[in-house]
């Protein structure tokens, strides 16, 4: 694991890029670049920039959606660039383990069940991320992280990273006490100065209330946790505009709407026609802070509890 047992969640589309990942690595954590939605050359550029900005500190990885048609090409590209780890969610892939062995890259699947945790260990995972219903984006379960974490920790003999709902030091301590080796945080870093979210989008985070957090049906085939934007409301009502152009970016798609374009519009600040993924506890965050200050406060909170 990293010097500080915190992984910054890989948030697509283009919320977590080199600037955010390197800032997290510089503080001793693991910074993830969200590869989903990127072209291969763009990903190469981001990885190289993250390496340069992190000055060899911490670890730099990528997160990629298994459901993406370009999944294998993107993880191979990252492996060729000497990435430290590959985190994969929104589906389960056996291909990733062969890539990990070929390039000697750590493979970290996102799972939500004992069954997939055991399969991951058998196939050669270096660690697993266990994601509960509190997480942002695509969800693999409707069970709380605190419900599923202890059983998975007991079932495998490799590092288990807990994901879903953590925004402060107190949350991290609770998950570590349940047996986690580390904690993945997305929302807290989405609302950072280094996040690639637009200024308008960061403003939305700070204005959120608990009742603004909803779950929509994603065309990927999973539930997706998002802010109740006008677009999300249309999706909840089954009235989201169907795509007029299709890039065939997903292996399987219901074509309810274009998830890649909806997320991209949100990242650019289009709150009306964009889909804004969020964790269940984003509404608890009231400041946009530099990554360095986020780490300082978290460490201070953890030490005060210990």
Task: For the regions a language model picked out, list residue spans one by one.
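Active-site entrance/lid segments in N-terminal catalytic domains of soluble metabolic enzymes
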Residues: 1-159
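Active-site metal-binding loops of divalent metal-dependent hydrolases
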Residues: 11, 165-166
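Conserved active-site-proximal phosphate/metal-binding subdomains
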Residues: 135, 142-161, 167-306
């Amino acid at each position: 694991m990293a010097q500080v047992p915190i992984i910054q969640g890989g948030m697509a589309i283009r919320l977590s890029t080199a600037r955010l990942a390197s800032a997290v690595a510089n503080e001793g954590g693991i910074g993830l670049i969200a590869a989903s939605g990127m072209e291969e050359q763009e990903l190469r550029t981001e990885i190289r920039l993250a390496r340069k900005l992190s000055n060899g500190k911490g670890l730099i990885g990528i997160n990629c959606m298994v459901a993406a048609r370009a999944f294998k090409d993107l993880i191979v590209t990252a492996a060729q660039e000497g990435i430290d780890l590959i985190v994969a969610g929104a589906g389960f892939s056996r291909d990733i383990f062969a890539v990990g062995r070929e390039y000697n890259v750590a493979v970290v699947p996102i799972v939500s069940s004992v069954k997939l945790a055991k399969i991951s260990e058998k196939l050669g995972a270096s660690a697993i991320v266990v994601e509960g219903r509190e997480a942002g984006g695509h969800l693999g379960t409707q069970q709380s992280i605190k419900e599923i974490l202890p059983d998975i920790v007991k079932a495998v003999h490799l590092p288990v990273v807990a994901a879903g709902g953590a925004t402060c030091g107190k949350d991290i301590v609770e998950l570590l006490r349940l047996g986690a080796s580390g904690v993945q945080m997305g929302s807290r870093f989405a609302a950072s100065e280094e996040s690639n979210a637009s200024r308008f989008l960061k403003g939305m985070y700070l204005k959120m209330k608990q009742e603004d957090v909803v779950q929509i049906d994603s065309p990927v085939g999973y539930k997706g946790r998002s802010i109740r934007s006008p677009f999300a409301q249309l999706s909840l009502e089954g009235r989201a505009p169907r795509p007029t152009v299709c890039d065939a970016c997903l292996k399987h798609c219901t074509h309810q709407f274009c998830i890649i374009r909806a997320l991209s519009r949100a990242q650019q600040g289009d709150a009306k026609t964009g889909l804004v993924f969020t964790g269940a506890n984003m509404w608890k965050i009231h400041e946009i802070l530099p990554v360095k200050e986020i780490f300082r406060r978290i460490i201070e909170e953890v030490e005060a509890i210990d």
